[in-house]
Amino acid sequence: MDVSSEHTKDPGGEGGDGESLAARPSKIKASSGPPTSPEPGELESEPEEEEEEQAASQGGTAADEQAEAPKGLTAAEAAGEEGPGEPGRPAEPQPEPEEPAEVGAEEPAQPEPGAGPEELEAEAGAEELEQAAEGKEVRFQASLPLTRIDEEEAAAAPEAETERVEGEEEDKEETQRDGAESKERDGEGRPAKSQEEGKRLYGRDEFEDLEWSEEVQKLQEQQLRSDLLDQYRSLLVERNRSQRYNLYLQHKIFEALRRKKGLEAAEVADRGAEAEAPEKEQAYLRHLGMLEELKKQQADDLQWYHQELGQLKRQCQEKLTRVEKEWRRFQALKKQVVMQAMGSCRMRGGRQAALREVEQIQALEDKKEKEMSAVRLENIQLKQSLVHFETRMRTQEDLTQGLLLIDFEQLKIENQTFNEKIEERNEELLKLRSKVTNSVQVITHVKEKLHFMDMENACKKTQLAEIEAQAALGRDILTKTKQAREGLRTDNIRLNQKCGLLGKDSLLRDLEEKVDKTELLHRRLESLKRHHASLTLSCRGVRQKIREAKAFLPS
């Protein structure tokens, strides 16, 4: 069965869901908030997206026609190729009221009939990612005018009706083709080995599906991060523009207040503020009520978006399961046909060799399909990034064009202030010129005095040279006198050493006293010696007597 026949009905069903998803919040926002004019970059991006969708659909038609040429092998495939031009039919652009949602929601190209389940799942994941980004950006977009919304709804109604009718017809044709193919497969019957190969391929497909689901999740996270960064940059640009406009208004107010008379203007402003206080309070309460209504409306819209997102995810999962089922059926049928063709050719090695060769061919085909799906996924990412960059450039250009007038007014104000400063500087310049003349006179007087001081310094220098010569002469005389003084001092010391105690009465008197004392001490020493000698003689006599007495005593 041709896989592209199943994808021909997807734009219709998804278009209806996307139309209902985008039409409901636009009506609510248009009725609740004040109408705001759309950005010029959004209006310019809409026809370019329509041209890209038509080019992608034409490319899908050409690829389908090229892929359907070698499919006339069996009657089952011929029955599945009823409408080769249907997958590539250019999808009619759906006019949605929210322009930024169309930036990232470019309709993907139709898959080729030979695409694998991994590629189909990746494309379905990218489509789901674009729808999620569309749902996020709708919340941040201002509502369009009521007249434009009514015109778009009136233009979108017949297109949605025709797409619904075409989707129902394609569903009927698909059910008929499924019944015919099931009958043919029941009549032919497949061998037990082909069933085992199908089970093995099914297990491998499930493992690859898990890997692709992780990659799709990473892709969704990257896309969400890029969307949030884009929103942050746009809000930052809006903040800068508001700040500049605030400065412009402050300059205006400053100029208006400066033109008025100081105290009177302040009194009039106070009276006006007292009169406008109740009106401002009422306006504040009214805006608070509007804010509460908008918050409630935002919560309702968010709940509705979550419900629609869950429904779209379920539909996407059902379509993915159908695509995988049809892909496995198509691979099994292709293997059976190739085995029959090789069996009719009577290859060397028999059925086992043919089976091995078919497995190698299918493995190579799976590898190429994976490479092709990876390249297509990268192509989709690059297209989305290109669209984001283009919209960002357009918004920046629009903002710069809108800010040129504000810049011009600010430059006018700055020019006026600079002119006033120039007048002040001219007055200061006149004052400085008068000061310069006075300074020149003072400088000439100072120069004359400086010349006189130079002449006086020259005279002083000559006098200083003479005084320095005299000082040098006195310095030489001083050194000579110091040398003579040192010689006299040494002579005096030598003579003092030679003369001894001559001329020193106290020392001489002390010397005489010491001599007298020494003589007295010598005489006393002699008397003591004599007394000691007498004592020793008496001691000897006593000892002799004691020895004699001991000799007479009995022993």
Swiss-Prot record:
**Does the entry feature the keyword Cytoplasm, yes or no?**
yes
Q: Where is the composition biased (Basic and acidic residues)?
A: 1-12, 174-202
The answer on whether this UniProt entry bears the keyword Cytoplasm reads yes
Start-end of Acidic residues biased regions: 41-54, 95-105, 118-131
Q: Where is this region: Disordered?
A: 1-202
The record's subunit annotation is: Forms a complex with CFAP263; the interaction is required for functional activity in cilia.
Q: Which protein family is named in the record?
A: Belongs to the CFAP184 family.
Q: What is this protein called?
A: Cilia- and flagella-associated protein 184
